[in-house]
Swiss-Prot record:
L-aspartate binds at residues 121, 125-126. ATP binds at residues 10-18, 37, 119. Homotetramer. This is Argininosuccinate synthase.
Length: 411
């Protein structure tokens, strides 16, 4: 295709993207640069990945370490909004896509590429997330999505394609599960999960143990929160990524952070997935505990509205939008007073905030007791209740008059 001389491919080293490299070369007669975003996925997935890319036909392989930036600039802002998609999903895959796409775009512009390519299927959410980010950041770049273009439909087709071209690949014909991992979570789909009547086997879970296998003794962890961000574990200051990896290991041993959900994809289909977010689940519990102490009722309600809206923005691939920036700004303002310390108990798949304190706490033992009237005079409640219930009383009086045939709506 004319006008495309260099393509940057989001490369994972797996079967799909290994086949995409030669396919792009054959169909576009262009140089292919493989781009690998390290967002904290399994270390085995990155071993020898540059050599794999070159062996598949890439002229170059760029590996970018995005782990700290991912947690600091994408995970933490999302946490401050309180975003949870459809009540349970902590947006692990969704949060990683915008930083990968942004880094890809930067690489493409630096390398003088004309297009980017990805291995997302035409049935999933990720194609929208990647291409939405490109449209927002560099609309002049063309996007090539081979799964929407080629006639290969199965692992057998891909393996045969590579074999015919003498391209080495360690992938096998049988792949039970489809997995995606980053520093925040790991997702598993496929296999027995394709039937919602099947209970996930233990082979599904990678980072967490079952409640039955978890230790019989609880473990406690202390988190320090500053302006809505976790900054220390057991009084030890760590970087955001270090905090997350530490909590992943400790919480995973207790089976914390497992969910099995059937979610609504933005393309209209439902999909079932098992997600493990051990460290993130502990972080969320700590932040909610500090919020309970610090935020007044209307501010807490507003933060919950922000989270509900932001969950859809992130899930739907609209990170680089004015609305996203506005919600993050509002969440940051709310988080200014979210300072505190929380001790959490991890036990048999559950995490519970058992101790919490904040210098900005609105809770006071003195104010909450029933014995003291210096702050709260109980007699004042009568007037408040009469005003608070005024609309209800007017409605009831109107209904009573109508029931006996009277109409006093006119003066």
């Amino acid at each position: 295709m004319s006008g495309i001389n260099k393509i940057v491919l989001a490369y994972s080293g797996g079967l799909d993207t290994s086949a995409i490299i030669p396919w792009l070369k054959e169909h576009y007669d262009a140089e292919i640069i493989a781009f690998v975003a390290d967002v904290g996925q399994e270390r085995d997935d990155l071993e020898g990945i540059e050599q794999k890319a070159i062996a598949s036909g890439a002229v170059k392989c760029i590996v970018k370490d995005l782990r700290e930036e991912f947690v600091k600039e994408y995970v933490y802002p999302t946490l401050k909004t309180g975003a949870v998609y459809e009540g349970t999903y902590l947006l692990g895959t969704s949060m990683a896509r915008p930083i990968i796409a942004k880094a890809m775009v930067e690489a493409a512009l630096a390398e003088g590429a004309d297009a980017i390519s990805h291995g997302c299927t035409g049935k999933g959410n990720d194609q929208v997330r990647f291409e939405g980010a490109v449209a927002a950041l560099a609309p002049q770049l063309k996007v090539i999505a081979p799964w929407r273009l080629w006639d290969m439909r199965s692992r057998e087709d891909l393996l045969a394609y590579l074999e015919a071209r003498d391209i080495p690949c360690k992938a096998t014909l049988k792949k039970i599960y489809s997995r995606d991992a980053n520093a925040w979570h790991i997702s598993t789909e496929g296999g027995e999960l394709e039937s919602t009547w099947n209970e996930p086997s233990e082979a599904v879970w990678q980072w967490t143990v079952s409640a039955e296998q978890a230790p019989n003794e609880p473990e406690y962890v202390k988190l320090t929160v500053a302006k809505g961000e976790v900054v220390a574990v057991d009084d030890q200051p760590l970087s955001p990524h270090q905090i997350l990896t530490t909590l992943n290991e400790r919480a995973g041993k207790h089976g914390v952070g497992r969910i099995d959900i059937t979610e609504n994809r933005m393309v209209g289909m439902k999909s079932r997935g098992c997600y493990e977010t051990p460290g993130g689940t502990v972080m969320v519990a700590a932040l909610r505990a500090v919020e309970e102490l610090v935020l007044d009722r209307p501010t807490r309600a507003w933060r919950e509205k922000l989270g509900a809206e932001f969950s859809h923005l992130v899930y739907d691939g609209r990170w680089f939008t004015p609305l996203c920036k506005a919600i993050v700004a509002s969440a940051n303002a709310i988080a200014e007073d979210l300072d505190g310390e929380v001790i959490l108990k991890m036990y048999k798949g559950q995490v519970t905030a058992v101790q919490k304190k904040s210098p900005n706490s609105l809770y006071s033992e003195d104010f909450a007791t029933f014995g003291a009237d210096e702050v709260y005079d109980q007699s004042h409640a009568e007037g408040f209740i009469r005003l608070y219930t005024l609309a209800s009383r007017i409605r009831a009086m109107k209904e009573q008059h109508q029931a006996i045939g009277g109409d006093h709506t006119h003066g």
